[in-house]
């Protein structure tokens, strides 16, 4: 049989590429070494969907945000659970506080709205089992 596209690997990336290309009039073959798709790295991945605040690179941040929306839409379409659980980053020294503020300001400049700096008390209220001396926290609501 003739194929227009051959995809090697049936992990999350390979399957996503196959899905997107299936929207066009193409004959697609996906080859996976395991007995089923998503059995290798995709099976044990942390499954965190970031909101674009992690990076200082504007382009990567934009792609992360677009990816978030695509993943959320795909989950709804295929009835896959998708839950925004948020991400808490903490600083225990002055340099860490500086980095959190830098990340916060960078995220705000890129239009990421659901992100906030937290005081030590707010961090402990959110995560009362934290076992380090926290100076400040950064909370991103849109991380899933």
Tell me what each language-model feature is.
Residues 11, 34, 47:
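Proline-glycine-enriched beta-turn/loop adjacent to the NAD(P) cofactor-binding site
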Residues 91-96, 124-144:
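Conserved redox-cofactor binding core of oxidoreductases
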Residues 3-30:
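N-terminal Rossmann-like FAD-binding beta1-loop-alpha1 element of flavoenzymes
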Residues 46-126:
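Dinucleotide-binding Rossmann-like beta1-alpha1 core, especially the glycine-rich loop
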Residues 44-46, 131-132:
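Short low-complexity, flexible loop/linker segments enriched in glycine and/or proline
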Residues 22-44:
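Glycine-rich FAD pyrophosphate-binding loop
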Residues 24-26, 76, 128:
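Proline-centered flexible-loop/turn and helix-kink motifs
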């Amino acid at each position: 049989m003739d194929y227009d596209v051959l995809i090697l690997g049936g992990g999350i990336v390979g399957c996503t590429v196959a899905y997107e290309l299936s929207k066009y009039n193409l004959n697609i073959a996906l080859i996976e070494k395991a007995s089923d798709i998503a059995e290798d790295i995709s099976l044990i991945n942390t499954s965190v969907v970031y909101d674009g605040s992690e990076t200082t690179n504007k382009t990567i941040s934009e792609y992360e945000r677009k990816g978030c929306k695509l993943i959320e839409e795909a989950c709804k379409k295929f009835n896959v659970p998708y839950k925004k659980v948020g991400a808490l980053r903490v600083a225990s020294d002055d340099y860490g506080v500086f980095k959190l503020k830098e990340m916060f300001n960078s995220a705000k400049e890129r239009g990421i709205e659901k992100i906030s700096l937290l005081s030590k008390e707010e961090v402990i209220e959110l995560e009362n089992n934290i076992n380090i001396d926290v100076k400040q926290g950064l909370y991103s609501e849109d991380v899933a």
